[in-house]
Amino acid sequence: MPRTQLIADYLRAQARSRIDRVEKDDHGHNARTAIALIDAADYVTTLDEHAQVLVRLAVAGCFSGGRFDPGGEGERIVGDWHHDLGPADPAELLESLAEAAERGVALAPRPPQPRPAYP
């Protein structure tokens, strides 16, 4: 499945979650977030599969197991994102996700290196 479709599916699922969420005194936050995420999902499907931001997400390991996983920080970015707060447009959302994923890779513990055998 194309990476653009994996991201779009993820964003649409997050939008559905926001639509289903009922919170007292939300003042339309969930609705605005859902609409913004649907817009972002549509935007992603217009990107070339070799767009730099998609390559960055792939190198950071966001496409595994046949799905898009933005990591913990990326999930928080998506969860809090809408047009009133955070990135102003879908391109900025993707850029924020790529930056978060790259930070996650940089901070991840590295596996131990094998020790050379001594004669």
Task: Give residue spans per PLM region.
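Short, well-structured alpha-helical interface segments that form or flank functional binding sites
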Residues: P2, L6, R32, E92
